Amino acid sequence: KNGMSVIGFDMYNPPHTMGSSHGKARVIRKSYSEGSHFVPLLNRSYELFFELQDQTNLEIIKIIGGLMIAKKGANSLEGIKHSSEVHNCEIEVLTSNDIRSRWKIFNPEEEMEGVLDLMGGAVFPENVINTNLNFSKGYGAELHFNTKISKWISDDNYVTLKTETGDTYYGDKLIICSGAWLPNLLKDLKLPIFIERQVLFWFDPINNSEIFLPENSPNHSWEYEDGKMIYIQPNFGDGIKAAIHHEGYEVDPDKLDRKKIHQDDEKKLRSII
């Protein structure tokens, strides 16, 4: 689009299920609890998602709000408030009574507080990826799927890429977005990166299914212990998504059995919920 010559590589055929870029709906939030320095990146991301949605007939992003619930004064709540103050993000600070009266599915304890990010919502990753791939091809990008990069070298002149099949490519700049394979491609930099197993669940509500729909429930996260939380996304058609934030063990992405769910995975999540 900007007149550059671009080549893209993926070791699988996108959109695929080998990264964090699938699952029909993914959480997006603007007033970031982990640091206000992320907000400018998020502002630009929102712009691009809405622009993509305007250019297509596909649902790319949906704003439903994002609610964080924790004990008053928790770092997770204060981080959201700080990001809001620095970057003028739209939030609401809610008491436990406010939360109970607004949403039927919540029953927080009295010492808990909520912060609602009004721009929280969902991004629909398969639509995003397919649309961006189609647009990039239309602008002249060269895309190589099922192609694994085995090595890259950067010097004063250019970047060299080598594929597992022995092909070599040269360029001026390199952007690496390899997800769980990032430590392998950046091992010479000795960065403190490790891959953690994450398990997500989708539940079908037995009763009162309407209260779990996006129009009746925001994305929500609960800090059930200091620094430990679960996050839940309403039903966008495949069920209610729920997961524990982090707390997984370190894995090798090439050796991980992605189809195996341990009995304790679901048991722990259900006990927290």
List the model feature ranges, each with a label:
Residues 22-33, 248-256:
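Short glycine/proline- and charge-enriched loop/turn segments
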Residues 2-5, 57-62, 168, 173, ...:
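Active-site substrate-recognition segment that forms the wall
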Residues 51-61, 83-90, 139-142, 155, ...:
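Surface-exposed helix-capping loop/turn segments at secondary-structure junctions
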